[in-house]
A protein has these predicted regions:
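N-terminal "pre-motor" subdomain/linker immediately upstream of P-loop NTPase catalytic cores
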Residues: 1-78
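Hydrophobic alpha-helical segments
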Residues: 11, 186-189, 193
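Conserved RecA-like P-loop NTPase ATPase core
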Residues: 14, 156, 192
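Short solvent-exposed strand/turn elements
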Residues: 79-88
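Phosphate-binding glycine-rich loops and their immediate beta-loop-alpha structural context
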Residues: 87-89, 93-189
C-alpha cells in the first residue's frame, strides 16, 4: 500500500510522493494509462496498491487506486479544473486576533485582513520576522477557524525554521529548504497550489 501526493511529469507518467511532496525511497511509479483513465491530476492525494519493483525501475509500480483525495475513484474526470473556476474576492474573513496578547493578529486584522480562500506571499530580508508572523497567522487560523484545513508552504527557508513551524502549528507544513535546488522549490510549490 502507498499513500501520497501525485506528481505528474510532462510526458504523462507520474509518481506518488510519500515524503512531504518530495522524492523519497517509499514513492511509487504511476503509469500514464492509470492517470489518463482515472482523470488523476497533479496534487491529488492517492491511496493505492503497489506491485513488486521491476529490475530496471527505481520505484514499484502502482497497480490499483483505492482512494483519491479521501473519496471514491469514480467521477474524477468530471471535476472542474482550478484554472477554469471563477475567481471571486474572499467574502468570509479569517480573524487573526485571539485574546488580549494577540497584537500581531490584531494588526493584521486592521491593516491587511485575510479571507477564506485567499493566498498570500510574504517576502522579506533575512531576520525580519516573516517566519514569526507566518507562525502567528497559522496559529490564529487554527484557533479561530478549526474547520479550515491549513497548508503552510515554506520555500528557501532554513531547516531549523521548518522544524519550528512543524512543531508550532496544526496543519500541513510543506517545505523546500535553502539547501535544495531552485527546481525543487518550483515543483513543490506547484504541487501545493494544485
Amino acid at each position: 500500500t502507498v499513500e501520497g501526493i501525485l506528481q505528474i511529469s510532462n510526458e504523462g507518467y507520474g509518481w506518488i510522493r510519500t515524503g512531504n511532496y518530495m522524492e523519497g525511497d517509499n514513492d511509487a511509479f504511476v503509469h500514464q494509462q492509470i492517470i489518463r483513465n482515472l482523470g488523476l491530476r497533479p496534487g491529488d492525494s492517492v491511496l493505492g496498491m503497489v506491485g513488486p519493483a521491476r529490475v530496471n525501475s527505481k520505484y514499484p509500480p502502482l497497480l490499483q487506486v483505492t482512494q483519491v483525495n479521501g473519496g471514491e475513484v469514480e467521477g474524477l474526470k468530471d471535476r472542474p479544473r482550478f484554472k477554469d473556476l471563477t475567481p471571486i474576492f474572499p467574502n468570509q474573513p479569517l480573524t487573526m486576533e485571539h485574546g488580549k496578547d494577540s497584537i500581531t493578529g490584531r494588526a493584521i486584522d486592521l491593516v491587511a485582513p485575510i479571507g477564506k480562500g485567499q493566498r498570500g506571499l510574504i517576502v522579506s530580508p533575512p531576520k525580519a520576522g516573516k517566519t514569526t508572523i507566518l507562525k502567528r497567522i497559522c496559529q490564529s487560523i487554527t484557533i479561530n477557524n478549526p474547520e479550515v484545513h491549513l497548508f503552510c508552504l515554506l520555500v528557501d527557508e532554513r531547516p531549523e525554521e521548518v522544524t519550528d513551524m512543524e512543531r508550532s502549528i496544526k496543519g500541513t507544513v510543506v517545505a523546500s529548504t535553502f539547501d535544495m535546488p531552485a527546481e525543487n522549490h518550483t515543483v513543490v510549490s506547484e504541487l501545493v497550489i494544485e
